[in-house]
Amino acid sequence: LVLDLSNPEVQEFVYKSVHDILKDNPQIAFVKWDCNRAVTNPGSTYLPADEQSHIWIEYGRGLLNVFKKVRDSHPDVHFMLCSGGGGRLDYGSLRYFEEYWPSDNTDALQRILIQWGNSQFFPSIAMCCHVSASPNHQTGRTTPLKFRFDVAMQGALGMDLQPSTMNEKEVIFAKEAIKTYESIRNIV
């Protein structure tokens, strides 16, 4: 179900839901705003019949309104926009987020093309690129840790690894790779 964000009452409901959680839990420092549901049956019970063709514009405006209100109310919370799945990534949205997640596909080989494509339009440093496990849980592909770090250094480096499952050699390599990334981050 996709909420009808062309409706100001729905916008207020979404804003208040997020705002109340953050207000009541001041220890929350990070929020990933996931947008994994595409609109498959567009229409609005709020918009008049002769404005149904405006749903995409009004939905977008409503979503941006919610983003703005949440950010204005919680300027110290770090927000990540997730476009994996629903494709919700544009400059209008990005101005309310420090970073974005370009795809739920974390296979390093496939991420090369995904990240390259994203970098043609959006700033690389805002693109979250994580080192994930090998074999990859989506493709089953086994890739060396160095390759996974090299690919993840194309944007904002992160790790989707459990350090407790890494051997000593991998931990040492990861620490060195992170130091290398920190020395080149200003170039990214």
For each of these PLM feature ranges, what is it?
Residues 160-188:
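Glycan-recognition and catalytic regions of carbohydrate-active enzymes
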Residues 1-146, 156, 160-171:
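Active-site neighborhood of glycoside hydrolase catalytic domains
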